[in-house]
Amino acid sequence: MDFEEAEDINGIRFAWNAFPSTKVEAGKVVVPTGALYTPLKQREDLPIAAYDPIYCSNQSCKSILNPYCAVDPNGFWRCPLCQYRNPLPAHYHGLNPENLPLELQSTSSTIEYITARPVQNPPIFTFVIDLCQDEDNLQALIEDIIVSFNYLPPNALIGLITFGTMIQVHDLGSDKINKSYIFRGDKEYTDKQISEMLNRPISTQLMQQQQQQPGQMNPQLANSLTRFFLPLEDVEFQLTSILENLSKDPWAVANGARPLRSTGSALNIAVNLLGLTYPGFGARVMLFAAGPCTLNPGMIVGNQLKEPIRSHSDIDKDNAKHFKKATKLYENIAAKAVKNCHTVDIFAGCYDQIGMLEMKNLCNLTGGTLLLTDAFTTSIFKRSFLRLFNKDDEGYLLMGFNGNLEVRTSKELKISGLIGNASSLQVKSANVSENELGLGGSSSYRLCSTSPRHTYAVFFDVVNNQQLPPNAQSYIQFITHYQHSSGTYRVRVTTVSNFLTSDEQTLTNSFDQEAAAVLMARITLFKAEQDDGADVLRWVDRMLIRLCQKFADYRKDQQESFRLGPQFQLYPQFIYYLRRSQFLQVFNNSPDETAFYRHVLLVEDTNNSLIMIQPTLTSFTLDGEPEAVLLDSVSIKDDRILLLDTFFHILIFHGKTISQWRKANYQDLPEYSNFKELLEFPKKEAAELLHDRYPLPRFIDTEEGGSQARFLYSKLNPSVTYNTNDFIGGGGAGGGAIVLTDDVSLQVFMSHLQKLVVSGSS
């Protein structure tokens, strides 16, 4: 079975599909023993059991019955992780290979249990809308929010908060008039203050009236915080009316000033109010922001336009005066959301930065969406926002709420940590390693929200010190508890087994260079959040050199003898493109753009992450089939159309000759129908790529000499530049385009790598 087939079945990709057998050997392989796991990966033939799982009785294990368990005729099963002998339930007695229960069948390495415990509340959605924006942008946003009601379950609880200079919490339980409560935008309210201001006691007299007048609104709704979150089917008309009557914030904006925007206080109120009302139940706070917060708490920039918003350089030099204070506020709000299992989504609809860098942990720790768009009027926002509410074949939302991921291992392994959109629950079980990588010190992680897209990097420590027999196996079990949008609690269980080997050839053959590159990219991003950028790049280079010294074939000090086997051949170029990517080279990006790009890489699976690291390039010509070509400047030819997929952008580039023919409208002439077809091919291919991608990529149609061709040139390996010999000698015209850059080419990078490897340097 190849790596992608295994991923299709279990949603998991390992860097090493066989593990080093001892701690010493594991320390020499450079790339950590890790896995990329997608708990809710969609699978048509997923085994589903409509009963509760059977757990191992060993309190320090608590793994779940799975196909790797040995079952004896006396009604016992042996746990492969801890070797504990457990009694089977009475109705499982007398098992044989022909009548195995679902969870013991070989096809059930991944299985989902629908437990008997019902969810007490439906999912909750709170819309937090910025009113400091122009009318067109605001109206487009309101239209999309109203459309989204068609995608939500009718019993979903809905809340609404709007903000500008002041904050309005809308009371949806008031059926006669539209009622809202006003809060100051420049004050940080505690949950106690919010409760005292909004939560009125239920009077005995009112309760008696309720009993005498059946059919009237429940006093619980009229007099408690639950009146701010009501079923969509009950309040849709009123909510739509409120939204349609929203208008731009009336607070005057002086010349040379930014609007007074209270994003920080509005988010604080939304998260606290949900925490007071529905702690421990699936909920999303959806922020729609059209500019930076200009009021404390949470100020990103002052309201005077003469004060520029912070840049990467300002942050690096500690010149961003609001940065640390704002970051601390949003981290505190994120901690409250995590405690209550609530998710925060942030949608930006403006050219301005809104403060995503400061707010990123609101999404990164809660599994929320971070989406950067130029305006709420764009199709990128509209289609991406509505895709968040995609449904499965049964009509249920493809999102899991209020989840947690538990990782169980056999005795040879311990958990080093996790990197992804989750938060640690600090469960220090016996299988937790002292060597932390990412969010360490725990075997259990909170997933406030998860989906079929959410992928988590989990790292392991090989702790075995003894020589093992041939074909010794280790076992890992991932247990994901979550609240399904159908109103049930579910448990998704994936159990996998890996050989432990001391044979270097077996280890080499088990190496998945694609998964390894993505895992190393995640570690690199984790380091980039804490360390200096130059130090991170040096670390990346050292790791690559050490890996090649361990697994390449070469003779000392003979560069031409350097060879990498097929399992490692692509890995150096993945690292080359990672070094050049927007994830690490932040010079041309704002802090908000960097936060957005990094957030998406921490969510996606192996294939999508690889596209972000090393984009794909496809060539279309008149006399051949579409083919993948090198991501290199030599691939640009006059008679070619190129399709570039960077995940965030889909770009169609027309070569010089193709562009001239297109401008001459040859495609409109009957005798050039083949040229018309050529122009359509890449558009069809692009449409397929756009179909399921989240967030929706920006589509660019450009040509040789076009201003937006820079998006293509910036991604290409500059094998021909303005200062190479080819260019100086007049070459390059037939051998690709000239790239005006001082960046090192892949060929030079590989030459330096080989030189350092064979010299024994690190």
From Swiss-Prot:
Pfam families: Gelsolin, Sec23_BS, Sec23_helical, Sec23_trunk, zf-Sec23_Sec24
The keyword Cytoplasm is assigned to this record: yes
Binding site for Zn(2+): 56, 61, 79, 82
Membrane topology: Peripheral membrane protein
Subcellular localization(s) per the UniProt record: Cytoplasm; Cytoplasmic vesicle, COPII-coated vesicle membrane; Endoplasmic reticulum membrane; Golgi apparatus membrane
Entry GO CC: COPII vesicle coat; endoplasmic reticulum exit site; endoplasmic reticulum membrane; Golgi membrane
Keywords: Cytoplasm, Cytoplasmic vesicle, Endoplasmic reticulum, ER-Golgi transport, Golgi apparatus, Membrane, Metal-binding, Protein transport, Transport, Zinc
Coarse class of the protein's main subcellular location: cytoplasm
Similarity comment text for this entry: Belongs to the SEC23/SEC24 family. SEC23 subfamily.
Free-text function comment from the UniProt entry: Component of the coat protein complex II (COPII) which promotes the formation of transport vesicles from the endoplasmic reticulum (ER). The coat has two main functions, the physical deformation of the endoplasmic reticulum membrane into vesicles and the selection of cargo molecules.
Protein name in UniProt: Protein transport protein SEC23
